[in-house]
């Protein structure tokens, strides 16, 4: 059975956030045969990057990626095996609760921005125990 991945993306400025996360999602599908759901809070930004995308659709498929609208009023969703919190976005509390209840618990990664600063090497892969009791790991590309 292939692993499932959830990638959460808050569009902050321009299209970098959604562009990087969509590219990562497509690579996980195409190169590693993973099942990937990309949660995006601004589908209009996504639609400008992805020909054929519908900025109004709550769920749509592009290049094998299940692209879902990340609404402020979060609707319950089963957590994936691997969860990526991209670029310091914050997962919905109900999703974190569902992660805590899942057995085994998902691998939770905090994907950070690219940096060439020296301190990055010492922080890459570090665990961070969250108040939920789940470990989150920092990933610096």
Briefly describe each language-model feature range.
Residues 2-6:
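Extreme N-terminal starter segment of soluble prokaryotic enzymes
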Residues 8-133:
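Active-site and donor-binding regions of nucleotide-sugar-utilizing enzymes
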